[in-house]
Amino acid sequence: MAAQPQDREGGAQLAGPAAEADPLGRFTCPVCLEVYEKPVQVPCGHVFCSACLQECLKPKKPVCGVCRSTLAPGVRAVELERQIESTETSCHGCRKNFFLSKIRAHVATCSKYQNYIMEGVKATTKDASLQPRNVPNRYTFPCPYCPEKNFDQEGLVEHCKLVHSTDTKSVVCPICASMPWGDPNYRSANFIEHIQRRHQFSYDTFVDYDVDEEDMMNQVLQRSLLDQ
């Protein structure tokens, strides 16, 4: 079903080309880039998953990752939560429709969705083998904010934290873009929080590039917890 621009009480509003290109973007947390879970609206009007917000509030002087204003505990985004419960999207595997609140649990067990992901990964691998010059470099990365480059993953995280912590520009994550499932055109609205939450570990240590992203993330989370 088509998604309509939401008001300030529902969360960050998309309009124009951005809304048309990503009609479900208003249901996506700018930190974890997943459909909101227990969405909470903070005083500046932006919305985060409850768990993501708790992480963002940990620094001594927390700021909103979207607008960089002072961050404070928010209130439950009841209207947005209602819309997530009532808005449908389709599974790319079985093509059945599900409410946004149910789609994440569904794709975790849908064999057709797993096949869809594997076909995409295999196609990417096949194309890369035919065009070796286009194989992404997964060892060093450029900074998406400035001309600096040749960072390893940990170096890029540290550089962005030290140099670009107040930069509000939406940028493409070079680490995600290098993955077989990565979208080189997807711009994170909150790259600093994203890179700190999703890329504190080394993909080369944990990742089997022959599996899909869902399985990969589960493996990474399990192994990273064991290493703590």
Swiss-Prot record:
InterPro entries, per the entry: Di19_Zn-bd, RNF114_RING-HC, RNF_E3_ubiq-protein_ligase, ZF_C2HC_RNF, Znf-RING_euk, Znf_RING, Znf_RING/FYVE/PHD, Znf_RING_CS
GO biological process, one term: cell differentiation
CDD domains with a match to the protein in the record: RING-HC_RNF114 (cd16540)
Catalyzed reactions per annotation: S-ubiquitinyl-[E2 ubiquitin-conjugating enzyme]-L-cysteine + [acceptor protein]-L-lysine = [E2 ubiquitin-conjugating enzyme]-L-cysteine + N(6)-ubiquitinyl-[acceptor protein]-L-lysine
Chain positions recorded as Zn(2+) binding sites: C91, C94, H106, C110
One GO location term (cellular component): plasma membrane
Pathway(s) it belongs to: Protein modification; protein ubiquitination
Positions of modified residues (N6-acetyllysine): K102, K112
Zinc finger (RING-type) boundaries: 29-68
Record's subcellular location: Cytoplasm; Nucleus
EC number: 2.3.2.27
Enzyme's top EC category: transferase
A Pfam family assignment: zf-RING_UBOX
Disulfide bridge map: none
Sorted UniProt keywords: Acetylation, Cytoplasm, Developmental protein, Differentiation, Metal-binding, Nucleus, Spermatogenesis, Transferase, Ubl conjugation, Ubl conjugation pathway, Zinc, Zinc-finger
Maturation and modification: Autoubiquitinated. Polyubiquitinated in the presence of E2 enzymes UBE2D1, UBE2D2 and UBE2D3, but only monoubiquitinated in the presence of UBE2E1.
Assembly and interaction partners: Interacts with XAF1, the interaction increases XAF1 stability and proapoptotic effects, and may regulate IFN signaling.
Biological role: E3 ubiquitin-protein ligase that promotes the ubiquitination of various substrates. In turn, participates in the regulation of many biological processes including cell cycle, apoptosis, osteoclastogenesis as well as innate or adaptive immunity. Acts as negative regulator of NF-kappa-B-dependent transcription by promoting the ubiquitination and stabilization of the NF-kappa-B inhibitor TNFAIP3. May promote the ubiquitination of TRAF6 as well. Also acts as a negative regulator of T-cell activation.
The name this protein goes by in its record: E3 ubiquitin-protein ligase RNF114
Gene, per the UniProt record: RNF114
